[in-house]
From Swiss-Prot:
Its main location: cytoplasm. Its cofactor is Mn(2+). One of its GO terms (molecular function) is manganese ion binding. InterPro entries: DDH_dom (IPR001667), DHH_sf (IPR038763), DHHA2 (IPR004097), DHHA2_dom_sf (IPR038222), Mn-dep_inorganic_PyrPase (IPR022934), Oligoribo/pAp-PDE_c-di-AMP_PDE (IPR051319). Belongs to the PPase class C family. It comes from Streptococcus mutans serotype c (strain ATCC 700610 / UA159). This is Probable manganese-dependent inorganic pyrophosphatase. Its EC number is 3.6.1.1. The gene is ppaC.
Length: 310
């Protein structure tokens, strides 16, 4: 039997890479020929994680079949438009995810582990425990990092009641102080000055099909929202170029202040009225403040979905 590829979503974040690496290792311990790969290069936050724990980044692939794989395992996503290019030509045998289920179907039954927790890594941690497999230090490190990243160090409303205990245990195994390491890791991902506008709007971006519209929702983390808004003109040009190249009807950019847990929403496209209705605000110069919003999954996408379907 050929190897099974394990990967997270396009534009991978720390949880996409961490959960796929950790789950591939677990599957190998259980006798499955599984290999972690990625659908893009690590961002600066994830690069910090991999360097800290001395781990090589998983190879970047564009096609599962080109790697000789007929079967794949998805972590941290399930929607096909967020997955590998030839997802419909291979068999999805497992999914480990903590997002909504949409635009997903398979020809055969499969194992799906879906939980409304803070990260896919939280679920993989439980799978280690359930299978009685010891977690190596570096694997604990990448899972912890995925949880920290997705919950902004357990401050996001996506944080599940079980996540703090998971984080504490993983931090102990990884040999790090949760708060000290977590803050250093998050800050590593806020260095946006070296990024072009095109890179900035694609660092952490996902496409959602909302009532027939292809809506791109991107997020950048920062410690200074105004520093990002100073580049608004070039950011808007990059957004328009991305829309033209990919057919997005709308583009929503979350500029998230990780220290104060707020976001500025920058929106362009055909349905900005629906964006305004979703958050009950008025866009001025294409952007508006959204107090307390840090989670795309819980505080932006559901609201947009309801508004676009309304």
């Amino acid at each position: 039997m050929s190897k099974i590829l394990v990967f997270g979503h396009q534009n991978p974040d720390s949880d996409a890479i961490g959960s796929s690496m950790a789950y591939a290792y677990l599957k190998r311990q259980l006798g499955v020929d599984a290999q972690a790969v990625a659908l893009g290069n690590p961002n600066e936050e994830t690069a910090f994680v991999l360097d800290y724990f001395g781990i090589q980044a998983p190879p970047v692939v564009k096609s599962a079949q080109a790697e000789g794989a007929k079967q794949v395992i998805l972590t941290d996503h399930n929607e096909f438009q967020q997955s590998i290019a030839d997802i419909r030509e291979v068999e999805v045998v497992e999914v480990v995810d903590h997002h909504r289920v949409a635009n997903f179907e398979t020809a055969n039954p499969l194992y799906m582990r879906l939980e409304p927790v803070g990260s896919a890594s939280s679920i993989v941690y439980r799978l280690y425990k359930e299978n009685g497999v010891a977690i190596p230090k570096e694997i604990a490190g990448v899972m912890l990092s995925g949880l920290i990243s997705d919950t902004l160090l357990l401050k996001s409303p996506t944080t599940h009641a079980s996540d703090p205990a998971v984080a504490e245990d993983l931090a102990k195994i990884a040999g790090v102080d949760l708060q000290e390491y977590g803050l250093a890791m998050l800050k590593a991902g806020t260095n946006l000055a070296s990024k072009t506008a095109a890179q900035l709007v694609d660092i952490d971006a996902k496409t959602f099909e909302l009532n027939g519209s292809q809506v791109r929702v991107a997020q950048v983390n920062t410690v200074d929202i105004n520093e990002v808004l100073e580049r608004q003109n070039e950011i808007e040009e990059a957004i328009k170029a991305s829309q033209a190249a990919n057919g997005y009807s709308d583009f929503v950019l979350m500029i998230t202040d990780i220290l104060n847990s707020n976001s500025e929403i920058l929106a362009l496209g055909n349905n900005t009225d629906k964006v305004e209705a979703a958050f009950n605000f008025t866009l001025k110069n294409n952007h508006a403040f959204l107090a307390g919003a840090v989670s795309r999954k819980k505080q932006v996408v559901p609201q947009l979905t309801e508004s676009f379907n309304g």
